[in-house]
């Protein structure tokens, strides 16, 4: 989560 800026919550 948040490794590629996709799951940036």
Swiss-Prot record:
Intracellular or extracellular location(s): Secreted
Presence of the UniProt keyword Lipid metabolism in the record: no
The protein's name in its UniProt record: CalliFMRFamide-13
BP GO annotations: neuropeptide signaling pathway
Entry keyword annotation includes Chloroplast: no
Sites bearing Phenylalanine amide, chain numbering: 9
Family stated for the protein in its record: Belongs to the FARP (FMRFamide related peptide) family.
């Amino acid at each position: 989560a948040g490794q590629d800026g996709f799951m940036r919550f």
